[in-house]
């Protein structure tokens, strides 16, 4: 196919146009008075949502070059979502603001490479200041505030997530399920999560969330490498196919030929199956597999116990209520086998007491926490499917934001932190940078005020006036868009996780700097 090539300003302007279209669509959702966006779906009802990254993923333009701009800014949103789980709209607004101002300066003759350096130095300065000002999350009140804010100012959701974290611990697993009623309820069940995801993306059942969801599955645990599918697994697969229940395979590894056979069975709809590599190494892997088998009332198929794959019966397999597998993790939600789990926990506690090695004790503590903590399941209630999808997205954001807050602390929300730091950045840049590097830093200094401007605009206020008002106060003072007041953000509970604020700026600056240093675009030419 022939290509279309654009250079310099033409290239950057085409990218900027695509970025503007996406930013406008996403930024209408920013703040407590942000509006919703309706997404048309090829199948099923339209989706009404308020989530930046979901909107960004849906936007695709006819013009190839503008679409490249959309894809670039979408990357800033997606990366922020992957790292912090929230702050995607802020990242989009920041990236767009840096690009717009940078383009003006490049057109006026500034050196793009020097501007890029200035942007990077300014970003590092702001990130270090966010870390310096962040307050650790010490009480349940702060957790409720973060969760409420991220779920769209829903205090009940905030309390529910705080309650869930209290029950399963700060490292615990919180899972979302679609409920059967209109009420959202919290349930604590036995279960555990480990950091290994599906071996092949062909196993995915929910392509939108890129995860595998299995209800009431069998689980095969083995410390062996699965090689000859015909001899080893076929008898078992045939037994499971008769039950019409899904299967989760947790093994040391699966060879290519064996994996191909399993994937083909999955794609043909013969068997709903997913394969995952077992966590850990050596003896620790065996112990973790045993923990999981006890949790699910199954057996580990290991040669140490004289068992082989070709003799496996259904009653040797683990059973779970639900399994969720993403590319990075596997969550098993089990049904009560409390007595067995308790005695296993007691056994691990005794091992901790008798162990001399600090490393060994740490790993045992980790196992104990995973096994005894359980999983908090929030059953999301809604009147319609459209409301259900929106609620699940908001709850997902709230859970991610809460975990991010626990990790790196909290700062004043509503764009206030960036506005206060922008004054310090201005002074620092004037004293430490010169020429085009200084221009790059001042671009960031102005850009970081844009999220607050947009929050104020969405609430019907003048963004520039609000920014100046906030700047004239102390660090903890900001703008409460819901009520239109200048308030103490900590007292009012308008707080952001430091990790979200940091990630949004880092990813936005990274993408924006790349766009400003773009000199040529090559895209497929559309034939008339």
From Swiss-Prot:
Free-text function comment from the UniProt entry: Together with its co-chaperonin GroES, plays an essential role in assisting protein folding. The GroEL-GroES system forms a nano-cage that allows encapsulation of the non-native substrate proteins and provides a physical environment optimized to promote and accelerate protein folding.
Keyword Cytoplasm: no
Organism the protein comes from: Pyropia yezoensis
One biological process term in Gene Ontology: protein refolding
UniProt enzyme class: isomerase
Quaternary structure and interacting proteins, as annotated: Forms a cylinder of 14 subunits composed of two heptameric rings stacked back-to-back. Interacts with the co-chaperonin GroES.
Molecular function GO labels: ATP binding; ATP-dependent protein folding chaperone; isomerase activity; unfolded protein binding
Family the entry assigns: Belongs to the chaperonin (HSP60) family.
Subcellular location: Plastid, Chloroplast
Coiled coil: none
The name this protein goes by in its record: Chaperonin GroEL, chloroplastic
Short name of any one Pfam family annotated for the protein: Cpn60_TCP1
Catalysed reaction, written as an equation: ATP + H2O + a folded polypeptide = ADP + phosphate + an unfolded polypeptide
UniProtKB keywords: ATP-binding, Chaperone, Chloroplast, Isomerase, Nucleotide-binding, Plastid
GO cellular component: chloroplast
Matches recorded under NCBIfam families: GroEL (TIGR02348), PRK00013.1 (NF000592), PRK12849.1 (NF009487), PRK12850.1 (NF009488), PRK12851.1 (NF009489)
Upper classification of the organism: Eukaryota, Rhodophyta, Bangiophyceae, Bangiales, Bangiaceae
The keyword Isomerase belongs to this UniProt entry's keyword annotation: yes
């Amino acid at each position: 196919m022939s290509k279309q090539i654009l250079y310099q300003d033409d290239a950057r302007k085409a990218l900027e146009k695509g970025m503007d279209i996406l930013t406008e669509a996403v930024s209408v959702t920013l703040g407590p008075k942000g509006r919703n966006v309706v997404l048309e779906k090829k199948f099923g009802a339209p989706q009404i949502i308020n989530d930046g990254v979901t909107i960004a993923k849906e936007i695709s333009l006819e013009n190839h070059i503008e679409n490249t701009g959309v894809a670039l800014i979408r990357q800033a949103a997606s990366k922020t979502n992957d790292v912090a789980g929230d702050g995607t709209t802020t990242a989009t607004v920041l990236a767009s603001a840096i690009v717009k101002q940078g383009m003006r300066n490049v057109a006026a003759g500034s050196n793009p490479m020097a501007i890029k350096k200035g942007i990077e130095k300014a970003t590092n300065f702001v990130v270090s200041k966010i870390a310096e000002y962040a307050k650790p999350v010490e009480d349940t009140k702060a957790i409720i505030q973060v969760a409420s804010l991220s779920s769209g100012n829903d205090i009940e959701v905030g309390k529910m997530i705080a309650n869930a974290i209290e029950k399963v611990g700060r490292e615990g697993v919180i899972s979302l399920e679609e409920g059967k009623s209109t009420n959202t309820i919290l349930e604590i069940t036995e279960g555990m999560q480990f950091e290994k995801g599906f071996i092949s993306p062909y196993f995915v059942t929910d392509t939108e969330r890129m995860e595998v969801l299995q209800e009431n599955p069998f689980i095969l645990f083995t410390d062996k490498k699965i090689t000859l599918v015909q001899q080893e697994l076929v008898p078992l697969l045939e037994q499971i196919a008769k039950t019409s229940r899904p299967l989760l395979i947790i093994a040391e590894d699966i060879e290519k030929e064996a994996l191909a056979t399993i994937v083909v069975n999955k794609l043909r709809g013969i068997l709903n199956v997913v394969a995952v590599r077992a966590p850990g190494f050596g003896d620790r892997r065996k112990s973790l597999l045993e923990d999981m088998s006890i949790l699910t009332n199954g057996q580990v198929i290991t040669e140490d116990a004289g068992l082989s794959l070709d003799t496996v019966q259904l009653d040797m397999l683990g059973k779970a209520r639900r399994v969720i597998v993403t590319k990075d993790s596997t969550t098993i939600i089990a049904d009560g086998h409390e007595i067995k789990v308790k005695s296993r926990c007691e056994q691990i506690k005794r091992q901790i007491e008798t162990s001399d090695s600090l490393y060994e004790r740490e790993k045992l503590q980790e196992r104990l926490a995973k096994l005894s903590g359980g999983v908090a399941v929030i059953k999301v209630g809604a009147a319609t499917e459209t409301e259900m999808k929106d609620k699940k997205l908001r709850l997902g954001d709230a859970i991610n934001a809460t975990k991010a807050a626990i990790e790196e602390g909290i700062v004043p929300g509503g764009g206030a932190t960036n506005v206060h730091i922008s004054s310090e950045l201005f002074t620092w840049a004037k004293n430490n940078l010169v020429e085009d590097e200084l221009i790059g830093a001042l671009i960031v200094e102005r850009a970081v005020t844009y999220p607050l401007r947009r929050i104020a605009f969405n609430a019907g206020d003048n963004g520039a006036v609000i920014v100046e008002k906030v700047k004239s106060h102390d660090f903890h003072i900001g703008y409460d868009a819901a009520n239109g007041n200048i308030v103490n953000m900590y007292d009012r509970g308008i707080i952001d996780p430091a990790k979200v604020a940091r990630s949004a700026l880092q990813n936005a600056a990274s993408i924006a700097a790349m766009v400003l240093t773009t000199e040529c675009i090559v895209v497929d030419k559309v034939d008339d």
